């Protein structure tokens, strides 16, 4: 499977060798990123966005890529993250297949695809790689560091590993460690991929591709990204029309089933299964408590920033609202002026992507006050 790189992507060559937290190193690796706005003369107006597991760095359209990005309504001139004021960077995570080096990339040493020879990936590796991009752009300190979902974990790792790198932080639907429920879901997703007979210990190709496994993994993910409240409102128990069903025993019958099938079918042709495995496991491993002898609040208190906003949705079952509350509590313990905000968005974990009316104003207010 090839990589899926958006047009207009920029690339930073990582230091070589690039050491990985859990052992191993990368040679001649790179990070894909995109930028919006203009960096001021003092390089004091920069914002770094760290995305979730599956997005690329194309958060919004720009001159080199007119396609709408995954956070189009949040980022741009006059929008909550106002590019008339801020110079915004979005980095594609190390280990992804959207431009940054990952299992789907070619190893320059062996001239073969990394596949499972890619070193074990940690959230901290993505954090260190992202900061190389920031420094390469001539930025010593970010005005703000924004992380959502997995990116919220990466942002916390950045703040722990690189003190004074940011003056403020917005953590959106993120967490300081993976909870058992989230680990269990991701374990099932990985199992679905690995049990697909076409996975072949990571040695699949376009002809023999673990599509069924990745499709099931994505369906499991989508179920947890939204909420039962939204599923009820959007689909209820509505059945498919007769021309949308077939005679397959136990086949698709309800609209919700058809939605999951269509969504997953689109996804499997835009993401590499091995990259999914690596990024998924990196989230399970991340734990701020490791930085303070098992005390997660003490670990968060080690972070030194001026201001922070932790925001999430009460209907999020993957990164429950108490995890954002915990982030704010821990940061306050360390002296940060931290605010927690829980929203009643029905869209669950994905609310930050679609409920811009709910998430946009507090983000804008926070940034306007910097």
UniProtKB/Swiss-Prot annotation:
The keyword Glycoprotein does not apply. One of its GO terms (biological process) is methionine biosynthetic process. One of its GO terms (molecular function) is homoserine O-acetyltransferase activity. Its EC number is 2.3.1.-. Pathway: Amino-acid biosynthesis; L-cysteine biosynthesis; L-cysteine from L-serine: step 1/2. InterPro entries: AB_hydrolase_1 (IPR000073), AB_hydrolase_fold (IPR029058), HAT_MetX-like (IPR008220). Pfam families: Abhydrolase_1. It catalyses: succinyl-CoA + L-serine = O-succinyl-L-serine + CoA. The active site is at residues 149, 316, 349. Residues 45-354 form the AB hydrolase-1 domain. Residues 52-55 are annotated as: Important for substrate specificity. Its main location: cytoplasm. The keyword Lipoprotein does not apply. It is found in: Cytoplasm. The record marks 186 as: Important for acyl-CoA specificity. Keywords: Acyltransferase, Amino-acid biosynthesis, Cysteine biosynthesis, Cytoplasm, Transferase. Belongs to the AB hydrolase superfamily. MetX family. Transfers a succinyl group from succinyl-CoA to L-serine, forming succinyl-L-serine. This is Serine O-succinyltransferase. It comes from Xylella fastidiosa (strain Temecula1 / ATCC 700964). The lineage of its organism: Bacteria, Pseudomonadati, Pseudomonadota, Gammaproteobacteria, Lysobacterales.
């Amino acid at each position: 499977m090839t990589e899926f790189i958006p047009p207009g992507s920029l690339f930073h060559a990582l230091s070589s060798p690039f050491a990985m937290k859990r052992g191993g190193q990368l040679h001649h690796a790179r990070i894909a990123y995109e930028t919006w706005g203009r960096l001021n003369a003092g390089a004091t107006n920069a914002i770094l966005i760290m995305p979730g597991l599956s997005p690329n760095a194309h958060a919004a359209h720009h001159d080199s890529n007119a396609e709408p990005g995954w956070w189009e309504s949040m980022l741009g001139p006059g929008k909550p993250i106002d590019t008339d004021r801020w110079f915004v960077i979005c980095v594609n995570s190390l280990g992804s297949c959207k431009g940054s080096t990952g299992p789907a990339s070619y190893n320059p040493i062996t001239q073969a695809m990394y596949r499972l020879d890619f070193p074990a990936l940690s959230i901290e590796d993505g954090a260190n790689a992202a900061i190389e991009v920031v420094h390469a752009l001539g930025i010593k300190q970010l005005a703000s560091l924004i992380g959502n979902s997995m990116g919220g974990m990466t942002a916390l790792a950045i703040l722990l590993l690189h003190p004074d790198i940011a003056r403020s932080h917005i953590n959106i639907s993120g967490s300081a460690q993976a909870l058992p429920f989230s680990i269990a879901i991701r374990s099932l997703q990985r199992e679905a991929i690995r049990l697909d007979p076409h996975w072949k210990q990571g040695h699949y190709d376009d002809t023999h591709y673990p599509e069924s496994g990745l499709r099931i993994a994505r369906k499991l993910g989508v179920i947890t990204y939204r909420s039962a409240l939204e599923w009820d409102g959007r689909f209820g128990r509505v059945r498919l029309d007769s021309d949308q069903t077939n005679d397959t025993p136990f086949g698709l019958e309800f609209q919700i089933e058809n939605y999951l099938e269509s969504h997953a079918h689109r996804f499997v042709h835009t993401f590499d299964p091995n990259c999914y495995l690596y990024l998924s496991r990196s989230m399970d491993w991340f734990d701020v408590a490791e930085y303070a002898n098992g005390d997660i609040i003490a670990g968060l208190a080690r972070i030194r920033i001026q201001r922070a906003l932790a925001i999430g949705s009460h209907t999020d079952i993957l990164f429950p609202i108490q995890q954002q509350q915990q982030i704010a509590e821990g940061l306050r313990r360390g002296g940060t002026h931290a605010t927690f905000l829980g929203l009643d968005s029905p869209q669950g974990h994905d609310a930050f992507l679609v409920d811009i009316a709910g998430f946009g104003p507090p983000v804008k207010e926070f940034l306007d006050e910097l």
